[in-house]
Each structure stands twice: as C-alpha cells, then as structure tokens.
Amino acid sequence: MKTLISLVLLSLLTLGAVVAIGFPSQPSVAAYNPEAQTSADETLKAFAAIQPIDVHVHMFETDAAFQAMLERLHLKLLNILVMDDTLPYRKELAPQISDTLALVRSSHGHVAWCTTFDPYKFGDASFTADAIKQIDQNFAQGAVAVKIWKNIGMEIKNGEGKFIMADDPKFKPIYKDIAKHGKTLMSHQAEPDVAWGPPDPSDPSWSYYQENPQWFLYNKPGFPSKQEILQARDHVLAENPDLRMVGVHLGSMEKSLDNIASHLDRYPNFAVDMAARMEYLLITPPEKVRAFLIKYQDRVLYGTDLDFLPDADVKDVLNDWQSTYARDWKYLATDETVQFAGKQIHGLKLPAPALQKIFRGNALHWIPGL
C-alpha cells in the first residue's frame, strides 16, 4: 500500500513539474486537446504549441511586454515594410529599414523582415537600377522578402497619366532579381470588392474605407477595375514561373474560394496569406472553407495584418494581438463556436497536418529564411 501511495505521489510531482515548465519546445498540434479548451489562456497555449509564424504584421515599436508575449507564444513575425505617402511614418523608406533592423536585433529571433522599394520614384530614369541595388542591400541585411503594395494599380501614375500596373516592364528586372536571390514577392494588389462599391456597411472591410476614403473608388471615374489590376498580377505570375509570390489578403479574392482555388491550380508559384481577411472566411459556409483549406493546405499561410504603431498603448496592442490569435486558433483548430458579426460561427477543427502547415510549415517553405 505504501509503495502504491509513493508511486501516485511521484506521478503527481512529475506532472506538476511538466506543467511548471510551460509550453513545449517542439511544434506539436497534439500537445493540447482543443476540445478541452475553456479559456483564452488555454487557447493561446495550444496556439503556442505549434510555434506559429505570422507572416504579415506591421511593427514600428516594440516593448518588453510585447517581447515577452512573443517568447511565451513561441511566435515569429514577418514585419512588412510599405511605402505610403499618406502616412508620415511610411513616407520615407530609409527610417523604416533602420527601425526594423533594430527591431529584428532586439527580438532574439522572433522577428524577420520584408523590405520594399519606393514606387513613387517610378518616373526616375534610374528607378529600376536603384530599386534592385537597394533590395539587394536589404537581402544582405537579412530581408527575406519584398513587398509591392496596392498603390501600384490604384494610385501611382506614369508620365502619361496612366496608372502603373504590377506587370509594367520597369518592374520585370526587379522580379527577376528577387527570384535570382531565392526570395519571395509579397503582393498586395487591389482591394476587397467593396472598395469599388456600392457602399455596404455589412462588409467586413467597410469600416476601413470609412477611415480611409481615398481607397474607396465607388463613383470615382478613371480608376482601373479590380479585374484589370488582378490580371496584371496574374501576368507577373505567368511571366515569372521561378518567382515565388504570396498574394496577401487571400490574393484580393476574398469572396471567392473558387477563384482562389483556380489560381492556385493555374500557378504553382502562387500562395496566399489570410491577413485581415479571416472575417471573410468566417462569413463563408464552414464546410466550404474547411474543404478548401484541407485541399490547399500547402498553399495558405497564416497572417493577420496586426500592427504596433508609433505611440500605441502597449496594453491595447497586447490585447488586440492575443485576442486575434485566440480567435483564429479557436476557429481553425477546434469545433467550438466563434462569435462574429452577431453570429455564432462553428469552428473548422482542421486536421493536425493542415494546422501545422498553415500556421508554420508553409511560411518556412514559401518564405525561406524565416
């Protein structure tokens, strides 16, 4: 009897030691039972167990509490630079590069970075050569990818007053250089359908255009159609079969999984991330989303588009990031319900191999160097 009691006590002590250690050091979807999750903390433990990679964030600051969150969640981020002349902290590229290099150094391996080039210098005679020189320098500094943004196609015009598109001949040598270095192009071309109108307050992206009306093109003549912009993007894919491209924001095909699927079938060098478009998946029939993610589990990368802006309140940032990660994991990994837009959305409970790829493996495959 004493022997039995001793064994029980030893087992309990061993269990306590394991619990005290914290999250596992190796990625494992099975390390936690999703069905047993009853709190956001438990959900985040399950999220952390897979050692997730968020391939789409925008960081301008960091903080000891934020770094602690990254370490606790075993989370790696891809910090993406963007040139945007409407925002003071995105108007100049050099300060962004300097700041992100400092963030990378202070992150202890939790932050990687994606550079960009200045499309507002498109009219310069040396534009292409200068862009290649700059991104090559950034590759030497550790950049793992290059971003092109929606201002190509929706804002910047050439000397003839026409909107420049992603397949403009000036960009071709840049794409060739990215492919030559084995890097990845992160492509944000076009916007959700609602940007072309008519107004739809029920659309998940509607609030963005209330705050950023310059990108709402309804009843604004002279702008390219969404189809024109995406056709130019597709032309880049076809012309550059050796170039890995991640179409961010579900490749701006957020309302049609069938359209995304046809693109993934047509272009083997193309993948998509989920950044800022999870809400569109949430309002799509769960069985359709689940079937799509299982079939194309090698071609979808997890991303959020979360940001840490200058002078942001750290507590608000931590709450926003952690609640987003908890919601997304709960939706994709469990069969519990997620609340969105006043509705109860049934979780997808994706198979473990699919979760491993979407939250980690695909990022490592499609963006080498992470």
Protein language model features and the residues they cover:
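H/E-rich (His + Asp/Glu) clusters that bind or coordinate divalent metals
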Residues: 31-34, 221, 226-235, 242-370
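Bacterial N-terminal signal peptides
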Residues: 7-17
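Acidic-and-aromatic substrate-binding clefts and catalytic sites of carbohydrate-active enzymes
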Residues: 56-64, 84-96, 120-129, 156, ...
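Active-site gating/metal-coordination segments in enzymes
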Residues: 45, 94-217, 268, 278, ...
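Hydrophobic faces of well-ordered beta-strands that scaffold small-molecule active sites
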Residues: 53-57, 77-80, 113-115, 146-148, ...
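An N-terminally biased module of ancient metal coordination in phosphate/nucleic-acid-related enzymes
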Residues: 20-110, 129-130
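Positively charged n-region of N-terminal signal peptides that target proteins for export
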Residues: 1-4
